[in-house]
Amino acid sequence: MSVELRVGNRFRIGQKIGSGSFGEIFRGTNIQTGDPVAIKLEQVKTRHPQLAFEARFYRVLNAGGGVVGIPNVLYHGVEGEFNVMVIDLLGPSLEDLFSFCGRRLSLKTTLMLAEQMIARIEFVHSKSIIHRDIKPDNFLMGTGKKGHHVYIIDFGLAKKYRDARTHQHIPYKEGKSLTGTARYCSINTHIGIEQSRRDDLEGIGYILMYFLRGSLPWQGLKAHTKQEKYARISDRKQTTSVETLCRSFPAEFAAYLNYTRSLHFEDKPDYSYLKRLFRELFVREGYHVDYVFDWTLKRIHDTLQEGRADQQQQQQQQQQRRGSEKEDEHPV
């Protein structure tokens, strides 16, 4: 007899679907409504509990409701040995979709994502929060009618960069250890400078080039220790010029990265300028905002291919049947 695992008497736990910056994530079901949910579990005994902070950040971001691109917290509490948080179940991550599409995205898809990603970070920053773990795994697509919306998740490493009431900025510091994912973190993060708004935006720039190029020059570097690997990534990132990184792609991508790298610690980024860079390029390329992403086309193509294969199989079976029927017609 299988035991049904429940959370808060409202949610049923299903299969594991991933891991976050801290803890594991499971698919679940709202028992009352039947709606699918995501359930994040973290051991109570963990050295640095993060789930309570993360739930608090989600609640700050969702205050007032009706927020686009931020999942809702449906429950947060302690269940036995685990801290638990239940949020809306979303679609696949941009990393998953990047892999699904052959590990390269078109300019059109990248530009449709870019504007939404910048808008999400702009909103997070407007609530006095920086994310500090910008990577394709932490941007997810919605489901159903919201399937074209980009969501930002995983606030396990997030931090307030200013007082929400007075807007007093946190002080500049050096000698900080690396927080985030080395592949996408800013050069200033590598050299130990306290993170601020500029660093989240620089990370988005690296994600966009990763999508267009298929990889980044500092991927796959070998090292004996994590610290040595971080140092090698930092060195390659600093010695690869923006122009080299963005070569053969529209100038707007180099302009984006040069702008984010030019910002000072407390600067408020000009998000409108950054979104406009990509929106104007999108229009100039003759694209339309139809939300037909590369994965939309690939799914249609794969479905058509499957349909053709099924059709061919049916035709072959029909021909074989006709052949056997003709054999039956001949007298022995």
Swiss-Prot record:
Functional summary from the UniProt entry: Serine/threonine protein kinase. May phosphorylate ZC3H11 during unstressed conditions, leading to proteasome-dependent degradation of ZC3H11.
Annotated binding of ATP, by residue: I17, G18, S19, G20, S21, F22, G23, E24, I25, K40
Disulphide bonds in the chain: none
Biased composition (Low complexity): 311-320
GO BP annotations, alphabetical order: regulation of ubiquitin-dependent protein catabolic process
GO molecular function: ATP binding; metal ion binding; protein serine/threonine kinase activity
Effect of deleting the gene: RNAi-mediated knockdown in the bloodstream form inhibits cell population growth and leads to gross morphological changes and multinucleation. RNAi-mediated knockdown in the procyclic form inhibits cell population growth and decreases ZC3H11 phosphorylation.
Active-site feature positions: D133 (proton acceptor)
InterPro entries, per the entry: CK1_Ser-Thr_kinase, Kinase-like_dom_sf, Prot_kinase_dom, Protein_kinase_ATP_BS, Ser/Thr_kinase_AS
Cited Pfam families: Pkinase (PF00069)
UniProt cofactor(s): Mg(2+)
Protein name: Casein kinase I isoform 2
Family: Belongs to the protein kinase superfamily. Ser/Thr protein kinase family.
Main enzyme class: transferase
Catalytic activity: L-seryl-[protein] + ATP = O-phospho-L-seryl-[protein] + ADP + H(+); L-threonyl-[protein] + ATP = O-phospho-L-threonyl-[protein] + ADP + H(+)
Alphabetized UniProt keyword annotations: ATP-binding, Kinase, Magnesium, Metal-binding, Nucleotide-binding, Serine/threonine-protein kinase, Transferase
Temperature dependence: Optimum temperature is about 27 degrees Celsius. Loses activity at 41 degrees Celsius.
Residue ranges with Basic and acidic residues bias: 322-332
Residues covered by the Protein kinase domain: 11-282
SMART domains, A to Z: S_TKc (SM00220)
EC number(s) per entry: 2.7.11.1
Region of interest: Disordered: 306-332
